[in-house]
Amino acid sequence: MQDKSIKKIVLAYSGGLDTSAIIPWLKENYGGCEVVAFVADIGQERGDLEGVEQKALQSGASECHVVDLREEFISEYVYPVLQTGALYEGTYLLGTSMARPIIAKAQVELALKVGADALCHGATGKGNDQVRFETTYTALAPQLKVVAPWREWDLRSREALLDYLKERNIPTTASLEKIYSRDENAWHISTEGGVLESPWNAPNKDCWVWTVDPLEAPDQPEQVTIAVEKGRVVAVNGEALSPFGCLDKLNAIGARHGVGRIDIVENRLVGIKSRGCYETPGGTIMVNALRAVEQLVLDRDSFKWREQLGLEMSYVVYDGRWFAPLRKSIQASAEALAEEVNGEVVLQLYKGQVTAIQKKSANSLYSEEFATFGEDEVYDHRHAGGFIRLFSLSSRIRALNEKK
């Protein structure tokens, strides 16, 4: 049931076919309401932003606001997740999941600024993004109403959307030929649909956008040096850069070596399994650099705790609960562990692989004196016997009981 009391809606606008159709649809179905378009710049293809304001206005928006969120996205969303080591279902670096809360937060801020009484997104009724957007809306501005066109309208195909715009003389560069659904930001690009809808089909070359085929990558490996401070990448090859600057540089380096490709089937929050090809070249390099420093710095219990934090964080972020107390608690714990994660790593990139070949840290717990396989004077091997007897005591008692 469409709420005719809504007077002004802020739409999360991308300039694509769906959100271009949403603007006139909102005006027609919500009593001629005013639609303000909000565009989040989170590092997507620059061409997607060219002319986006004019496109929004031509579609019927009263205003279009483009907000640069690139640095905030990497510094305040990506880096905290990196510190936990989160990988959803062991492989996915959460590129789309991390982007939705910052988009929704900035959208809410604009809505409050312009006096809107509703928020709108273009996420479908089968995906995770509707949950992520609306959970954020509720956490930050529960008084604002939410409009989700894909759960209301009867425009169910790309052809129907194109016809809808054509009937209203609204220009669009979209065409029927689009096969794949893609999501892109500074951290990653994902590809779904098309040939990927059957898990028995191998991805073709069109399923990959950023990275070269690892088999066609350079025959000579490339080394890259990463500086890490408090679990955050701060410099690449000796050049101090902002968080976005570090990622942007590593994306370019990693992409030419075919780094960061995964092809996975994941469990969506809404109960559906979906398949996607994800490319995260710079992020994959960063993850390897951080793990290399952690190997030097974190003791066994701290490393195990960090792994548990990463597992919990992966579900919190994937499920869209960024503004929940649990995420803040996990992040605080991860930041405490990361205080000592400082160092420098040299990684070798070769045909899709990333290998840490050199690493050092002022906080390293690695001691050559204790670790040597040669003769040493700092470790008394006789001490190990007592430790083993105590460590295995419960096993000894159990075995003795079984013999009674």
Swiss-Prot record:
Entry similarity comment? Belongs to the argininosuccinate synthase family. Type 1 subfamily.
Q: What class of enzyme is it?
A: ligase
The chemistry this enzyme catalyses reads:
L-citrulline + L-aspartate + ATP = 2-(N(omega)-L-arginino)succinate + AMP + diphosphate + H(+)
Keywords, A to Z, come to: Amino-acid biosynthesis, Arginine biosynthesis, ATP-binding, Cytoplasm, Ligase, Nucleotide-binding
Query: Cellular component terms, GO, for this chain's entry?
Result: cytoplasm
What pathway is it annotated to?
Answer: Amino-acid biosynthesis; L-arginine biosynthesis; L-arginine from L-ornithine and carbamoyl phosphate: step 2/3
User: Which gene is the coding source of this polypeptide chain?
Assistant: argG
- The entry marks the following residues as binding L-citrulline, namely 92, 97, 128, 132, 181, 190, 266, 278
For L-aspartate, which residues are the binding ones?
Answer: 124, 128-129
Q: Does the keyword Nucleotide-binding apply?
A: yes
KW Cytoplasm (keyword) present: yes
InterPro entries for the chain = Arginosuc_syn_C, Arginosuc_syn_N, Arginosuc_synth, Arginosuc_synth_CS, Arginosuc_synth_type_1_subfam, AS_cat/multimer_dom_body, Rossmann-like_a/b/a_fold
A single MF term (Gene Ontology): argininosuccinate synthase activity
| Assembly | Homotetramer.
Q: Where in the cell is it found?
A: Cytoplasm
Q: What is this protein called?
A: Argininosuccinate synthase
